[in-house]
């Protein structure tokens, strides 16, 4: 029995609140069970120096957790003077995942910056951030289209992410903190809306896992991501 009493293939309650903040071109509050993340997409004209004269746009992401998003307060990374390795890893994952959704040539000389701020963490913050950021990014692209800046939509695919793992010997979907901290295997999967993989991150925390278990986890992830993409579409319609 899972701590949340969910079935093995059951997602936590998931919702997206669009236009959550006033000023960003795209803004979403994603709620995944007790995990809550604000995802804002901002657009500026210009691209990083390494893309000068490349005739393509760029997307980058930043990720952070509020000091009391967890059970006990943690210092802001700014007060420590540097980002932690986990933060850097997650924001790179978000950026890679969303760039895979875009034709950057069609974006033109613009940079989209995604800001993900975790306001409450109960496992799955990186996957929730990707799911909310995809919607915020699409809202930002629609903003450019309404202004007549983009003539062709650069969006190739929606993207979504979910965690899977082996908890008490059973493959389960969408781990919360209680499960994640006790899982034998933990995996994050990012996919497109045409059933293609962007990233698979998997680690055995105790016993090694076998190909049969890997297949079960991948199938669980595909099942969950299909539902998440349906929720994204509902939020955007």
From Swiss-Prot:
Keywords on record: Nucleotidyltransferase, RNA-binding, rRNA processing, Transferase, tRNA processing, tRNA-binding
Source organism superkingdom: Bacteria
Enzyme kind, highest EC tier: transferase
SUPFAM superfamilies: Ribonuclease PH domain 2-like, Ribosomal protein S5 domain 2-like
Keyword Secreted: no
CDD domains the UniProt entry points to: RNase_PH_bact (cd11362)
Keyword rRNA processing: yes
EC number: 2.7.7.56
PROSITE patterns noted in UniProt: RIBONUCLEASE_PH
Catalytic activity: tRNA(n+1) + phosphate = tRNA(n) + a ribonucleoside 5'-diphosphate
GO molecular function term, any single one: tRNA nucleotidyltransferase activity
Binding site for phosphate: 86, 124-126
One Pfam match: RNase_PH_C
BP terms from Gene Ontology: rRNA catabolic process; rRNA processing; tRNA processing
Role according to the record: Phosphorolytic 3'-5' exoribonuclease that plays an important role in tRNA 3'-end maturation. Removes nucleotide residues following the 3'-CCA terminus of tRNAs; can also add nucleotides to the ends of RNA molecules by using nucleoside diphosphates as substrates, but this may not be physiologically important. Probably plays a role in initiation of 16S rRNA degradation (leading to ribosome degradation) during starvation.
Family: Belongs to the RNase PH family.
NCBIfam families per record: RNasePH
Subunit: Homohexameric ring arranged as a trimer of dimers.
Protein name as annotated: Ribonuclease PH
The species this protein was found in: Coxiella burnetii (strain RSA 331 / Henzerling II)
Gene name linked to the record: rph
């Amino acid at each position: 029995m899972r701590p949340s009493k969910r079935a093995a293939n059951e997602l936590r309650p998931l919702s997206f609140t669009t236009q959550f903040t006033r000023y960003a071109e795209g803004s979403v509050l994603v709620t995944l069970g007790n995990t809550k993340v604000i995802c804002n997409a901002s657009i500026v004209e210009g691209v990083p120096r390494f893309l000068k004269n490349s005739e393509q746009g760029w997307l980058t992401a930043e990720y952070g957790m509020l000091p009391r998003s967890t059970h006990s307060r943690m210092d802001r990374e700014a007060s420590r003077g540097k980002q932690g390795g986990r933060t850097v890893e997650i924001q790179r994952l978000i950026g890679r995942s969303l760039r895979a959704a875009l034709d950057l040539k069609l974006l033109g000389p613009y940079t989209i910056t995604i800001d993900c701020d975790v306001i409450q963490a109960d496992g799955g913050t990186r996957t929730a951030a990707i799911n909310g950021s995809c919607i915020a990014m699409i809202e930002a692209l629609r903003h450019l289209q309404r202004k007549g800046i983009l003539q062709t939509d650069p969006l190739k695919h929606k993207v979504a992410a979910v965690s899977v793992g082996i908890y008490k010997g059973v493959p389960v979907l969408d781990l919360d903190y209680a499960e994640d901290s006790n899982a034998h295997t933990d995996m994050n999967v990012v996919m497109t809306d045409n059933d293609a993989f962007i990233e698979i991150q998997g680690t055995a925390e105790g016993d090694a896992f076998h190909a049969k278990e890997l297949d079960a986890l991948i199938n669980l992830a595909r099942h969950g991501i299909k539902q998440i993409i349906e929720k994204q579409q509902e939020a955007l319609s």
